[in-house]
């Protein structure tokens, strides 16, 4: 029995597209609405079919899709990979009936179960064929030569050759297969980290971090490779770099890498566990005020995807959702964490309050919520009377912080004229 490749493709698509769509399309996902037409809404995550569809502004593209540029209208389009369009290999697949005897009418007869089993076997073989690398030899040579250049680069080496190699890897790292190849060998990512440390040119550093982020984005296999093949210093270096005077474009790339790593629940359990006293959330909170707008947006996207921005009341949620300003989202997050006892220690309390004061001092348009001001009034009174429970003994640093909190209540969040009366009452 012969099954044409078109027929088999139909069977494959019937069996395979549904699970693909169920994992790609999330009915609870975020929607994007056109600013000039609020009724024109579409999923933030692109929902593919077997037909070419235009990728709308702001949509995220899941990994594993065919993407092209429509030369007629210059719009980007994407669709699910269709096995029937594969041009390599035979145009048909053979399914041979088992011949147990030479009986004329029955020699080629198969039960429905036998036919189904054999078709499933052919489907399995077909999927294995589809899973093989589609990377051309030329691309692979370019990939390997570029990787070799990065791995053999030493401080003071040929920057032009390095830049060319990085450009090649930037182009290839967007492909899911090349992303996996880049991460399978632990020495490749380690070499990229070494290059980022050894070169002074920020353009070259930015290229390195862009390669890392592109190879990990929407690529869980690549993320798994990195988490298995790299040690903790890889992550530590990323967070350390955020807390330097590096350019904002580099910090944005690093946040993209961290964001990609949060696809993995094991990574989140270790680094973003709310019960962890050294949670990486605090590192992100600490650097936020020093970032520029695009990096601030990317940082808040990380917190949002980690589901850390919930807990506000309905009015606050509406305000957060309607605000495109990351500073406003950041402020709401810190206000809620402080007022609703969402901090784990006195040190975390100080960090959150100081950073909230800093961002409100930077942007006078930010306004505290009524609930936060009511909490702050009680907190300031409690601390001014020395009735606040501490993690340890009351120190001079604690006393200074309590005074700063009282001042911030009026100067930063309230009426500065009220500070004089508050200080007089305290005396």
From Swiss-Prot:
Signal sequence interval, chain numbering: 1-22
Organism domain of life: Eukaryota
SUPFAM superfamilies assigned: ARM repeat
Keyword Protein transport: yes
PROSITE patterns cross-referenced by the UniProt entry: ER_TARGET
Major localization class: endoplasmic reticulum
Biological-process GO terms, alphabetical: protein transport
GO cellular component: endoplasmic reticulum lumen
Residue ranges of the motif Prevents secretion from ER: 424-427
InterPro entries: ARM-like (IPR011989), ARM-type_fold (IPR016024), Sil1_fungi (IPR031884)
Single GO molecular function: adenyl-nucleotide exchange factor activity
Keywords, sorted A to Z: Endoplasmic reticulum, Protein transport, Signal, Translocation, Transport
Subcellular location: Endoplasmic reticulum lumen
Subunit composition and interactions: Interacts with KAR2.
Similarity section: Belongs to the SIL1 family.
Known role: Required for protein translocation and folding in the endoplasmic reticulum (ER). Functions as a nucleotide exchange factor for the ER lumenal chaperone KAR2.
Protein's name according to its UniProt entry: Nucleotide exchange factor SIL1
């Amino acid at each position: 029995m012969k099954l044409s490749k078109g027929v088999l493709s139909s069977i494959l698509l019937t069996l395979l597209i549904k699970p693909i769509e169920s994992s790609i399309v999330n009915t609870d996902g975020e929607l994007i609405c056109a600013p000039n037409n609020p009724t024109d809404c579409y999923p933030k995550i692109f929902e593919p079919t077997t037909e070419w569809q235009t990728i709308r502004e702001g949509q995220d593209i899941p990994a594993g899709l065919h993407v092209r540029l429509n030369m007629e209208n210059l719009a980007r389009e994407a669709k699910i990979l269709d096995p029937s369009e594969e041009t390599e290999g035979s145009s048909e697949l053979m399914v041979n009936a088992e011949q147990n005897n030479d009986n004329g009418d029955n020699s080629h007869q198969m039960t429905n179960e036998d036919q189904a089993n054999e078709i499933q076997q052919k489907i399995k073989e077909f999927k294995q064929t589809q899973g093989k690398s589609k990377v051309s030899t030329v691309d692979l040579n370019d990939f390997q030569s570029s990787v070799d250049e990065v791995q053999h680069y030493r401080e003071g080496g040929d920057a032009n050759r390095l830049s060319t190699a990085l450009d090649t890897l930037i182009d290839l790292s967007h492909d899911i297969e090349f992303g996996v190849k880049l991460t399978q060998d632990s020495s490749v990512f380690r070499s990229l980290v070494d290059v980022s440390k050894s070169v002074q040119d920020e353009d070259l550093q930015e290229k390195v971090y862009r390669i890392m982020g592109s190879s990990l984005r929407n690529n869980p296999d690549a993320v798994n490779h990195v988490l298995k093949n790299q040690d903790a210093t890889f992550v530590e270096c990323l967070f350390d770099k955020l807390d330097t005077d590096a350019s904002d474009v580099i910090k944005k790339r690093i946040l993209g890498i961290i964001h990609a790593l949060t696809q993995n629940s094991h990574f989140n359990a270790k680094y973003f566990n709310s019960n962890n006293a050294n949670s990486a959330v605090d590192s992100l909170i600490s650097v936020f005020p020093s970032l520029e707008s695009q990096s601030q947006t990317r940082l808040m996207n990380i917190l949002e995807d980690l589901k850390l921005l919930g807990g506000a009341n309905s009015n606050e949620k509406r305000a957060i959702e309607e605000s495109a300003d990351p500073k406003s989202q950041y402020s709401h997050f810190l206000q809620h964490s402080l007022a609703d006892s969402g901090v784990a220690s006195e040190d975390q309390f100080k960090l959150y309050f100081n950073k909230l004061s800093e961002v409100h001092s930077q942007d006078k348009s930010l306004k505290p919520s009524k609930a936060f001001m009511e909490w702050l009034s009680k907190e300031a009174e409690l601390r001014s009377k020395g009735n606040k429970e501490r993690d340890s003994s009351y120190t001079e640093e604690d006393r200074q912080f309590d005074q700063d909190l009282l001042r911030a209540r009026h100067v930063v969040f309230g009426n500065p004229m009220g500070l004089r009366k508050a200080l007089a009452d305290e005396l």
